[in-house]
Amino acid sequence: MTMMLAFGASWLGAVWFWRSTNRVPATDDLVLYLLVLPLALLAAFWLGRKIYSGISMPAAAATSTAAAQPAAPVAPPRGPSLSLVAAAVRAPHGASPAELGATLAENKARPALDPELNDAYGYPVMSARIADIDADATRTEMSDWLAANHMAPHYSDEQWRALSAGSEVVVELSAYLGAHPLLELHAGQVARREPLSLPMLQLQPVWQADWKPEHRQAAALWFRHLVIQSGWPEDRITVAPERGAVDTEAGTVLARLLSNEPPALAMLVTCGSHLGTGSVERLENGGALFSANLPQGQIPGEGAAGLLLTDALQATLLGTGGEHPQLLAVSSGRLPHSADQSKRANAELLQELSAKALHDAGREASAIALISADTDHRTSRVMELMGVASEATPQLDPGVDIFSVGASCGNCGAVTWLTALAVARQEAESRKAVILCISNLDPFRRDVAVIGPAAAVPV
């Protein structure tokens, strides 16, 4: 009801004002009055409720002085963890996790009217575009390599944009591997046929759902080629086997990596772009493209993100003088019905997954310093995220301590959440605190990850 009142009052007031003044609203007006204003009203309501609860709770506690003193809480056992040695992103509002995190903190990152794409009525669509992607250079270099290796997949223009961003991420992460101290020993061990000390690098791509098998296979081999070009031995890298639809779910891939027998060294990378005529037409034909008439539609985005994950030994060998943030736990689930079709937001599943992830990580919700999410501007997703924040982390300020990557960088499938994870790693490192990373962009799938700092955090 609160959500309906906030959005209803804002929209009706804006429409009445524009009609009474005979004014045609600009794009900034649409974003401000149809999105920003109602969300600000909701945030103010939640903040007021939190302040009221903080005042009333001590008074309620004073009425039960006879209660027995509770025993000190026992920290739940922790499962396996992986060190997040490095992260890389290419996003519309940042070419690194630190740059993107700073922009999100300033609340200045917003989509804009696209300079190239129009809807069916000829109006520019709202998008989140990376300005400096050099797709032509990637197309030329990769096409020559594909021809030399007898592969000829047909990539669309938007796929070339994705591959350009993804290639930059792979090259950046590969540079960290060059510091491995066992690289110099490897060639000698191979020549002498001795047991190899250098670990096997597992390259794990996460794909867009509409990429065909031939697109995925060629791109995976291209990324492998880039890692080898950066100096990593060809015999110490393997591409994870294809698993079909599972390869589009970053949460499933992370959970598998975070198993009882995690790999010693893994590179997780994803890339995508929805900034093409085909993607815009699909969204528009499905009644899912954001416009002035459909403010709950999706805003297409693009980008790439990657993580370099290792066990404790490899993290020490690759260390740069300090320890690394940890991926402590991942919890995933599916909604019984599409969130796009539900009449009201339901945060129950996301709350359960958050509680489970925190339990598996051995952390309390009170230790969380920030939430990094792939949530976009849509009311259903915002309300779901705020439902988790208000229940599990009342200590957080929704306007300051929650980063919504999707609202700033648009919708780009797995890229959006992996970008949020990269930002979470950066914040865990800089704040030396626990970060909760949430995914609720998909209509059905929900994921929660817990990122911890290098040092132990009191629970």
Each PLM stretch: what is its role?
Residues 274-279:
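Active-site-adjacent substructure of cysteine-protease-like catalytic cores
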